A protein has these predicted regions:
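Short, well-structured N-terminal submotif of metal-dependent ribonuclease cores
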Residues: 1-39, 54-64, 113
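Alpha-helix capping/helix-boundary segments
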Residues: 10, 43, 88, 105-106, ...
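Short amphipathic alpha-helical segments and helix-helix/interface helices
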Residues: 24-28, 70-71, 106-107, 122
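Active-site neighborhoods of divalent-metal-dependent phosphate/nucleic-acid chemistry enzymes
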Residues: 78-116, 121
Length: 135
């Protein structure tokens, strides 16, 4: 069973159903229980914050409540909350200078949890050699 770390953007794009093919396939597998998608709580909070502010994602305006989005992602959805414990923090402080605050936590979680890849659009993560999935 594959395991992946998702960033906030991928969660938002999932909510508006506009994921690119490979990322959509992974989320579909997770919905079927065949793959695990994890996201640090901060990535989930960023996505829920965007829902609360009716942010536009890929030309689609987010509607609904943060609670409905939480249910769609975690409650009844394909995403689980990745722990942020000492191991993640140890990895975070080692890489924080190479990334912004959000990307550093995504990469640290990916490393600590040993996931197969990161579901993200971020070019900075891709350019540093971490396995990413988007297209």
């Amino acid at each position: 069973m594959g395991t992946y770390t998702a960033d906030a953007v991928s969660l938002l794009v999932y909510l508006v159903d506009t994921l690119p093919q490979r990322a959509d396939q992974i989320f579909t597998e997770a919905e079927a229980g065949e793959t695990v998608i994890q996201a640090p709580s901060t990535a989930l909070v960023e996505a829920l914050y965007s829902v609360a502010r009716d942010k536009n994602v890929r030309g689609v305006t987010l509607t609904g409540t943060p609670e409905a989005a939480r249910q769609a992602l975690v409650g009844n959805g394909p995403v689980s909350v990745a722990p942020v414990a000492d191991e993640e923090l140890i990895r975070y402080v080692r890489i924080v200078d190479a990334f912004n605050i959000h990307d550093a936590l995504i990469v640290a979680s990916h490393q600590a949890q040993g996931t197969d890849a990161i579901i993200a659009t971020d070019g900075v993560i891709q350019e540093t050699g971490f396995e990413t999935v988007w297209k």
